[in-house]
Every structure is written in C-alpha cells, then in structure tokens.
Amino acid sequence: MAVAQQAWSPGADPAPSAAPVSPGWRGALRLDFARRGERTALVRRRHQGPLVVQRTFHPEGAPCHAYLLHPPGGLVGGDELDLSVEVGEGAHALMTTPGAAKFYRSSGDWSIQRQVFRLAPGATFEWLPMETILHGGSRSRLINRFELAEGARLIAWEMVALGRPGSGDHFPRGVLDQRLAVNCEQMPLLRERLSLNADDPLRTAPWGLQGQAVFATLLASPAPDGLEHDLRDALQVPPGVRMGATRCPEGLLAVRVLGPGVEPVRKTLEQAWRTIREPVVGLPPCPPRIWST
C-alpha cells in the first residue's frame, strides 16, 4: 500500500510544538496508522529533518511493525525532536528503534525530545524503543504523553542510561527533566516528573536510583487483575537488577527496573513484554526482527 509522505515545515498543521526558541536543529515526524482490511498500515507520514521511519513489516499478520531512526549524530544543546503518532480505530502498531537515542554535552541549552501518542477506540500500540543515553554534561528534557480512547490497549517503555560507565562516563555533570503523562478519555491515569541533577542525592538514595546507572519504566493498559503478581513470578531478573510492579486501580500496570547497565535492564524489559503481551494485547510475543541483529 502506498504511504502518503509530506515534508513537514515548522508552520504546517498539525505540528506537535512551536518552533524552537534556542539555536539548534529540529527534527519532527508525524505518523498515522490505520486499519486497512485485515491489516494495519502506515497511511501517512510527515517529516522534517533526520527523524524518519523507513519500511514497515508485518511479521505476525495484522499488526504493523515500524522502526524509528533517530539522528545518527545524537542531540546537543538546542536540538529538538518532535514525534507524534496516531493509531486509528481498531489498528495495531508496534514501534521500536534500531539503536539508542543519544544526548551529548550542552553549553547551556536544553536538548528536547517530545513524544505524543494518540490511540483511537479499540486501537493497540506497543512502543518498545532502545535506550536513551545521557552523556555527561548533557541537559536533556524527555517528554512522553499517551492519550488513550475507550478500549485502547497500550504497552510502552522508556529506558534511560546516565552516562556510559563502561566507557568511563559516570554522568559527573548534567541535568535530566523527564515528564510522563498517561490519559484515558482525557482523564489522568498517571502523571510523573523527574528533575535530576548529576549531584542529586536521589542517585544514591535507597529510595531513589540506589547507585544504578540505568533505570526504566514499562507501562501496560488495561492490565488484568493480578498480572503484577504473575509478572513477578515469571521473570528471571539478571544479577544486580531490581524490579518492581504495581497495578493501579484503573488497570494501569507500572513496572520499574533499576540496573548497572543497559543490557541487563533491556533483557528484563523484554522478558516483561513477553510475559504480559498476550494478557494485555491478546497476541503471543512476536519480537521485532531488529532485536535479533
């Protein structure tokens, strides 16, 4: 099926945010998924800059798998990325990334990544990106918002690495402003904000990051009652990794993971996804092909 493509100028409708006020480049991408017969298709994409999706895949029939390509050079101060994804009624899209998103040292301006995901009634969306690496000296703002209509189903995660300890970068300087919102029928299910400086006691506190370099959150909605217990029983957590799961009264499952490195945290997230996919989405696990490369 042909996909409508359009270059996206900053003033075009619907742009996800106003033009940046600080120096730097801007990348923007709008994706629309819709059900076409028995399959979901990427029916429209509008883009500006290097944030792109190339081809899509259907390895499990109806769901559409898409790979988001981040700028290969990463982000520095003043750069902005805007991603807007709409999943139409009854459609099912799964998105991942082939590599990490990287935020580099800033001289003072924020590097900003805004992501908005809108799910129509009966839509299913899985957002399973690779890690976001915050290099020492970066000033990073990560904004994620999920808007769910009635009957929509969601599995999504975000994994953040503070520096690259294996390469000697322990994030000695830098700032993170991380924001997360999940709404269902415009009613809030979850609101979170993390403001973290490199020297924040939260990094080593037992009630915080416990000295770990990598942290992640996985969300799933609607989660059947008791799924958090099934998940805890099923996971084989790698050494050094801490994991907790909570189900909110509204049916939103929140899974938190802490670990010393990207690989063990990612393996934990992938295990969790394999465990909860069928109860939440109604399909057995079908990992994106890129995970095997």
Swiss-Prot record:
Residues 1-22 are annotated as: Disordered. GO terms for cellular component: cytoplasm. The keyword tRNA processing does not apply. One of its GO terms (molecular function) is nickel cation binding. Belongs to the UreD family. PANTHER family: UREASE ACCESSORY PROTEIN D (PTHR33643:SF1). UreD, UreF and UreG form a complex that acts as a GTP-hydrolysis-dependent molecular chaperone, activating the urease apoprotein by helping to assemble the nickel containing metallocenter of UreC. The UreE protein probably delivers the nickel. This is Urease accessory protein UreD. It comes from Alkalilimnicola ehrlichii (strain ATCC BAA-1101 / DSM 17681 / MLHE-1). The gene is ureD.
